[in-house]
Amino acid sequence: MNIQALLSEKVSQAMIAAGAPADCEPQVRQSAKVQFGDYQANGMMAVAKKLGMAPRQLAEQVLTHLDLSGIASKVEIAGPGFINIFLEPAFLAEQVQQALASERLGVSQPTRQTIVVDYSAPNVAKEMHVGHLRSTIIGDAAVRTLEFLGHHVIRANHVGDWGTQFGMLIAWLEKQQQENAGDMALADLEGFYRDAKKHYDEDEAFAERARNYVVKLQSGDTYFREMWRKLVDITMTQNQITYDRLNVTLTRDDVMGESLYNPMLPGIVADLKAKGLAVESEGATVVFLDEFKNKEGDPMGVIIQKKDGGYLYTTTDIACAKYRYETLHADRVLYYIDSRQHQHLMQAWTIVRKAGYVPDSVPLEHHMFGMMLGKDGKPFKTRAGGTVKLADLLDEALERARRLVAEKNPDMSADELEKLANAVGIGAVKYADLSKNRTTDYIFDWDNMLAFEGNTAPYMQYAYTRVLSVFRKADIDEQALASAPVIISEDREAQLAARLLQFEETLTVVAREGTPHVMCAYLYDVAGLFSGFYEHCPILSAENDAVRNSRLKLAQLTAKTLKLGLDTLGIETVERM
């Protein structure tokens, strides 16, 4: 149930009846403060201006046409023309009953779309590092949310699996007589990469051989293709371990590397030339875009093929967007790539639109994100100034969480302790990131993320176990509760119920904007409201069975909402902490 959508429809009809245009926006929002009701319609200002009347006068006329019987207990005009809506307790009670009767907690399903989500995108022959964390976990939270809403989601792991470095790596492996690359661990490959690069820079004969190997690889030579495939396989096997540790839904089947688009590139360059979009300039093939200017104020040239015939990332990204529309039949494409790539993507997509490869009706959305910073406000590094490997970060998270939970649970079995430490440690790293607005940089701080107070994973996981403990203490049969009515008579009951019923609205925002922090803020709010409700509205010692059962049902919906909400974020819940 989307109460915001229901009220928007009702207010919109009343506005039209009061003389507003048919496309008027009621601007129904969740109220920021309790005294302004549960919802507020703010659309009178803009519409009244068009109609040449005072907003308050329009609001008064709208109220004469607004029928919210059975939904609102009170509707009032505030300030210059805001309409405050207070929900009817009986309506809240009925919606809570319906949410509990549904596995989906009453969340409706929008029109099903095919949505391609591009995220994670590590490089072959390199271990994943902290720079891959944000794309991987924010993208996965978006995927989980979209899938829960019923969309057909195609995960696209745009792996960097092509380029001159492969000639270099294969040449170096050969030189070291390590052709059986399948037996190597990725840590070896990292060392090989460094050594190969050093030789490539210092040994011209080696560099020449590496360049020849690239040509052979690109021409489809069987031996070189096999060596390349081994490098890719080793990398993705290692990355899968990281994905599984992170509780991320990516698998090998989701890999759509840069190499996938190679066969398309010559045709795209030829087509862009034929369409008059690409021209020869100083030996290269270039698309000049009026939408982007260089320092001199002239249209910026975007190279799609170099003098030597090589292609660029832009060419691949043009092919990639085309493929996602034509072959994957995407209705919408989301890219979780850091903000530094924004202009590059905008240029590629401008060419895509001009060439007619993807119609304007199919959104291409760059859901960019900021950087992960250390406490000093600089990019997060090791003490020695190197890049932090993702596996090392997760190891440290697990170790810190292990100490934390062992201290709080001295009698817990080793197995249970390990499971709990894993849920808390990995959850803490993910939640610390997901709870921040993705568009901003954020400070990585172990102490904050592992705290049991504030908007953190440990606090949210504990809040969930606290609700469950109510049922454990009372030894209640949840099935027997099903027929008991919900009675909303206290303000704290109403506030908790109203917020719980905004779960669908929250999911809708996350799905539309790709902003998991909105879900984190919502769940944190729910946990806080439950805490106040638990303190002031006795559950197990309620004055009678009817009130006790009703409050148990509110607790039940709280637990289900917290669990499902955390699941859309990829955060594991535990039964006890």
UniProtKB/Swiss-Prot annotation:
Enzyme Commission number, as recorded: 6.1.1.19
Motif ('HIGH' region): 122-132
The protein's enzyme class: ligase
SUPFAM superfamilies linked to this entry: Anticodon-binding domain of a subclass of class I aminoacyl-tRNA synthetases (SSF47323), Arginyl-tRNA synthetase (ArgRS), N-terminal 'additional' domain (SSF55190), Nucleotidylyl transferase (SSF52374)
GO MF term (any one): ATP binding
Reactions listed under catalytic activity: tRNA(Arg) + L-arginine + ATP = L-arginyl-tRNA(Arg) + AMP + diphosphate
Keywords, in A-Z order: Aminoacyl-tRNA synthetase, ATP-binding, Cytoplasm, Ligase, Nucleotide-binding, Protein biosynthesis
Pfam families named among the record's database cross-references: Arg_tRNA_synt_N (PF03485), DALR_1 (PF05746), tRNA-synt_1d (PF00750)
Location within or outside the cell: Cytoplasm
Similarity annotation: Belongs to the class-I aminoacyl-tRNA synthetase family.
Subunit structure: Monomer.
Protein name: Arginine--tRNA ligase
Taxonomic source organism: Salmonella dublin (strain CT_02021853)
Lineage of origin: Bacteria, Pseudomonadati, Pseudomonadota, Gammaproteobacteria, Enterobacterales
